[in-house]
Curated annotation (Swiss-Prot):
GO biological process entries: methionyl-tRNA aminoacylation
Lineage: Bacteria, Pseudomonadati, Pseudomonadota, Alphaproteobacteria, Maricaulales
Main location: cytoplasm
Residues holding Zn(2+): 143, 146, 156, 159
Gene3D superfamilies reported for this sequence: HUPs, Isoleucyl-tRNA Synthetase, Domain 1, Methionyl-tRNA synthetase, Zn-domain
Entries under InterPro entries matching the protein: Anticodon_Met, Met-tRNA_ligase_1, Met-tRNA_synth, Methionyl/Leucyl_tRNA_Synth, MetRS_core, MetRS_Zn, Rossmann-like_a/b/a_fold, tRNAsynth_Ia_anticodon-bd
GO molecular function: ATP binding; metal ion binding; methionine-tRNA ligase activity
Swiss-Prot/TrEMBL catalytic activity: tRNA(Met) + L-methionine + ATP = L-methionyl-tRNA(Met) + AMP + diphosphate
Organism the protein comes from: Maricaulis maris (strain MCS10) (Caulobacter maris)
Claim: Protein biosynthesis is one of the keywords in the record: yes
Record bears the keyword Repressor: no
Co-factor binding details: Binds 1 zinc ion per subunit.
Quaternary assembly: Monomer.
The protein, known as: Methionine--tRNA ligase
Amino acid sequence: MARILITSALPYINGVKHLGNLAGSMLPADVYARFQRLRGHDVLYVCATDEHGTPAELAADAAGMDVRAYCDEQHDIQKRSGEGFSLSYDYFGRTSNAPNIRLTQHFAQVLEEKGLIAERVEEQVFSIDDDRFLPDRYVEGTCPHCGFERARGDQCDNCGRLLEPTDLKEPYSKISGSKNLEVRETKHLHLVQTQMETKIRDWVDASTEWPSLAKSIAYKWLDEGLRDRSITRDLKWGVPVAQDGTPREGFEGKVFYVWFDAPIGYIGATVEWAEAGGGDWESWWRTDKGADDVTYVQFMGKDNVAFHTVSFPATILGSEEPWKTVDKLKAFNWLTWYGGKFSTSEKRGVFMDQALDILPGDYWRWYLTANAPEGSDAAFTWEHFQGLINSDLANVLGNFVNRITKYTVSKFDGTLPSAGTPGENEAWMAAELDQRLPALVANMEAMEFRKAAAEVRAIWAAGNEYLTKAEPWVKYKSDVDAAAVGVRTGLNLVALFGILAQPFIPEAASKILDALGVPDDRRSWEFDGPASALLDALPHGMAITPPAVLFAKIEDAQVAEWTERFGGAPEA
């Protein structure tokens, strides 16, 4: 039994996340976690809300709330949204909680002891009208690299380049809109990444289980040359700059930069899990305490890759303490919305709470996995969503389950028949499974989720083709035993389809397996023997209860309604 630690990029606290956030980190991490649990492995999947920094302060101000109260509210909302999509976190923590604060201050102290933290005076944008410094997203303006007119002071949303507020052209205050700005000196702590460049490059070179997207982004940063980066900000909300509980002299009004403390939040959330009775957190994170046998897998969108392959490793490796580093990193491209990006700040696209108002979570889980933005960006359109759901879930899966279970009730008194001997059609179905099940498992292990979903769809389609070949409803008229073979095989396929569906559409999978009375200990992904055994695994004579309709078709009128509500194109 392997031990697998899974983290997904922390969802930021400034509002409900959109479907692009879900598709690029939390959902694939959950699919993978469920798969590995079904394979019998010891899995710990942790996540947390990322709560510090300027966006939290700005969002709280806009809501007219205290920032702590705002974060409390938003954490609960995001937790409920995750539950609505059946995200199976072992723990969902918060970066504003005590464990992350302690760990962030610990890492800063250790890095300074190693000579990797330096106090420096730098120039920052100051708003005369607001009487304050404008770090990060408190200032916006024109990107000096691509000309995007709404670039933020920390990063351009259009080209993805990291920025400093002083880099922006025609800057203005996000608080007041004032352009009455000047550059003033302020003192901050810097992480001396230039001293870590060789060590980080060697570590990236040795990381063999990353997709090309992640590797290319890491090397791009390294090839451009690492810069020493400020890790503190002139803000009130964040991890205080302190050592052993004592504020650092001259830094009383400053906090650590959110991108310094946020990745440490993976560890902090695991500490929270342990404190809540989960277990020993150090055995998952400290290689001197048992984590040397852990496989650590990270999931994130491509905009987070540089921070996870360069900045966070600089913290971990620079400490020279025995911390577990990532083994496998799965990075995703964008899920696009009619040619543009989903955007939290622009309120563009469909958000998780809105999606759940429209349809249950399984509809979205399947679509976002089958359409995962892996090799390239993936486009969301209502028409594509409708077509995929109706074809895969309502027709190929739902119709199969409905047809064979109801026929069993109609012609075999609702019990699994035992008569008849398998023949050519059953051998064909077994051969399909012998070919496709190993491919499915291999794709899941490789975290190739589109390919995995395609294999599941192909297995469902093969089941439908089998019923067309077997024709139990035709054979019943002249050879009940031959019909019984088709029904028995079909019902075993229903059970197998439910087992295979668990990582992707867990609620529907449970309905299928519960209807067949499949016990929990028979729901694992164990396909080591010949597939023919899977086609006769259910007890003969068992009672069959057809499940309720699993997936309703999406009608054209619904697509028209949703297009009207959410739009079919990004804002200009």
